[in-house]
C-alpha cells in the first residue's frame, strides 16, 4: 500500500491539533518544540496516547523526547502509519504469574530483611455527602478488581527472587463502620492507624476500603493500597473506573492501554539485562558526583542522627495570590508548575548551602509505554534531576536548565532508583535508602475524579501524614485553584522550627522569583531575608 502527500499532510494537521489541545494553546506552531511550549513528561504521555488512539500509530516514547519540533513528531507518525495496522489490539489483563517487577522485588526482599523498613503504603480519603449505597459500592469495587489484575495480586519470595500471581477469585475488602457522634479528632486518629496497618503480601487483595458513617447524609470513604500493586497514577485510573461502575455505566474504554503488569515487569528485566543498566549508569554518572556522600543533601538545619525518631509534618495552604502567580509565570516561562516550582526549590537550596550544583530527589511516573498507561500497578521510580544553579543569573534561565534536567531524568528514569544507585556506587548497602536528601514533587491531588452521580458530592479529606524516609520531603499539591505545601520529616533530623522557616522562605521565594523572572536571583533572594534556610 502506498501513501500520498495528502495523507501525510492530514497527519501533520492532526498531530498539531493534538499538541494544541493537550497544551491548551492554539498559538502553538508546527516548528515549535513541545517542551519549550510548556510540555512535560505527563503531558507527553497524553499526546502519545491520543496519537495512538486517534491515528492508530504508536510512537516510541524516547524518539518523541528527541524530536526537535512538533513537525518532527508528525514526520515520525507519518513514517510509522503504514505499519500501524493491528497495533491497537487490546492486551488482556487476565490471570498471570511471573517474576515481580524490579521495584516490587527490591521492596519485598528489603522489607523481609529489615524490620525497620518503611511500610510502603498510600491512601486516599474522601468525604461523601448525599445518598451513598455501600452495596452498590461493593459491587463496583469487585467490578473494578475484575478488570485490573494488580488488584488481585499477591507475592512470594524464594532464593532471592520475588514472584507475583493473580488470584482470579480475590474479592474487594470492604468494611463499614458507624462513627456517628464521634469527635472528628478521634475519627482521624483512628484512620491514621487504619491506613498504616500493613498487608500480608502473600494474600490478595493488597488494598482495602473502609466506609465510616459520620451521620445520616455523610460518610468518609477510605482507600488504602500497598505500593506493591499501585501508584498515584493508578489511583486516578481506579477512581475513574470505580465512578463508572458505581453509576452502572460502561467502564472507560482502555483498549491498547492496559497491558498485563506481569508482561511489563518481564520486559523491564529483559531491558536491564540487555544493556539498559549500563546506559542508565553512564547517564547518571555524568550527572552525579563520584562520591555517594554528596548525593545525601543535608540542609544547614540538619541535626545528624544515629536513628530516625519523632516523625513530623507541616501543612501550609498557600495564599490564592501565590497560586495565581505560579499559573501566570508558567504561561510566561512556557514551563509546567512542576518545573517552575522545582526551580524555586533549587534556587533556595543553592542559597542555603552555597552549592553551585543541586540534586533533588523526585518521582518519575515511568509511563512512557502507551500500552500500560491505564494499567494499575507500580511503575513510578525515583530520579535525581541535577542542575547547575548560578544565583547571579535570572530565574528564567534557571527554569530552562531545570527543564532540561527533568527531561533527562524522565528519559533515564525507567529503572528503580536503588538499582541505578548501586550500579553507580557498588559500595552502597542493599535495601531502603538510609541517607538523607531533599525530595520535591508537584502534582494534582490524586483521585480527584471520583464521583458517584447526581446528588452526591465528593471532596478530599486530608489526614496528617507521617514521615517514613530520611531527609526532608516536600510536596506542592494542587487541589482545584488552590495550592497546599506539605513537608514531612523526622525531628531527629530537622527541628520543626527549621522546617517551618524553610517552608516560609520557599513560599516567599516562589512569589519573588515567579513575579520577576528576568532579574538576577541574587537581587531577589536577600540572604538577610532568607536567613531561616541557613539554620
Question: Residue ranges of each PLM-predicted region?
Answer:
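Gly/Ser/Thr-rich phosphate-binding loops and adjoining beta-strand/alpha-helix segments
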Residues: 29, 117-138, 187, 201-223, ...
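His-Asp-centered acyl/peptidyl-transfer active-site segments
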Residues: 115-121, 149-150, 217-218, 271-280, ...
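Low-complexity/IDR signal
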Residues: 15, 100-101, 137, 148, ...
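A short, small/polar-residue-rich loop/turn motif at beta-strand boundaries
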Residues: 130-146, 162-203, 281, 321-327, ...
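Short amphipathic alpha-helices and their capping loops
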Residues: 79-115, 138-183, 205, 240, ...
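Extended, hydrophobic beta-loop-alpha segments that form or line the acyl/peptidyl-thioester binding
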Residues: 58-62, 148, 152, 239-240, ...
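Active-site-proximal acidic secondary-structure segment that organizes catalysis
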Residues: 177, 210-263, 495-512
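Regions immediately C-terminal to embedded phosphopantetheine-bearing carrier domains
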Residues: 1-114, 118, 139, 143, ...
